[in-house]
Swiss-Prot record:
Keywords: Ribonucleoprotein, Ribosomal protein. One of its GO terms (biological process) is negative regulation of translation. GO terms for molecular function: mRNA binding; structural constituent of ribosome. This protein is one of the early assembly proteins of the 50S ribosomal subunit, although it is not seen to bind rRNA by itself. It is important during the early stages of 50S assembly. It comes from the Bacteria. This is Large ribosomal subunit protein uL13. Belongs to the universal ribosomal protein uL13 family. It holds the Pfam family Ribosomal_L13. GO terms for cellular component: cytosolic large ribosomal subunit. Part of the 50S ribosomal subunit. The gene is rplM. HAMAP family: Ribosomal_uL13. InterPro entries: Ribosomal_uL13, Ribosomal_uL13_bac-type, Ribosomal_uL13_sf.
Length: 153
């Protein structure tokens, strides 16, 4: 029997919507990353973009466990000598673009390379409950029901 390898033309992409309200960031991100790569499908092929299009709504209402809300620090570098900057998770979530917490968590769970950039384009994160993708008829994925640890108390 030959090994099956999925061709890009044979990929069936679905649209999935996830409500992130009250969900733990890391657990949500690992489920989203798996869906984006397509590892939940039996015909998964590592070098082909066979994952789904994922919409995450209410990204501003995600939760951190423990004291990470106050203590977790996100770093970025300006490119200049001594230009390392840091922001806390609390600062970002209460700021102008709270969806970046979820975007960064998912981004850092995906392998790097040309396929990474293509896969990341299938992720759409919105801070409110409104999204412009109703025409795609996304099906709802209830992450909270998958495991009781996915929801923060």
């Amino acid at each position: 029997m030959k090994t099956f390898s999925l061709k890009p033309a044979d990929v069936e992409k679905k649209w999935v919507i996830i409500d992130a309200e009250g969900l733990v960031v890391g657990r949500l991100a690992s489920i989203v990353a798996m869906r984006l790569r397509g590892k939940h499908k039996p015909q998964y092929t590592p070098h082909v973009d066979c994952g789904d299009n994922v919409i995450v709504i209410n990204a501003d209402k995600v939760k951190f466990t423990g004291r990470k809300y106050d203590q977790k620090v996100y770093y970025h570098h300006t490119g200049y000598p001594g230009g390392i900057k840091e922001r806390s998770a609390k600062f970002i979530l209460e700021g102008r673009f709270p969806e970046r917490v979820v975007e960064k968590a998912v981004e850092r769970m995906l392998p790097r390379g040309p396929l990474f950039r293509k896969i990341l384009g299938n992720l759409r994160v919105y801070k409110g409950s409104e999204h412009p993708h109703a025409a795609q008829q996304p099906e709802t994925l209830d992450v909270a029901a998958l495991n009781r640890k996915n929801v923060s108390a």
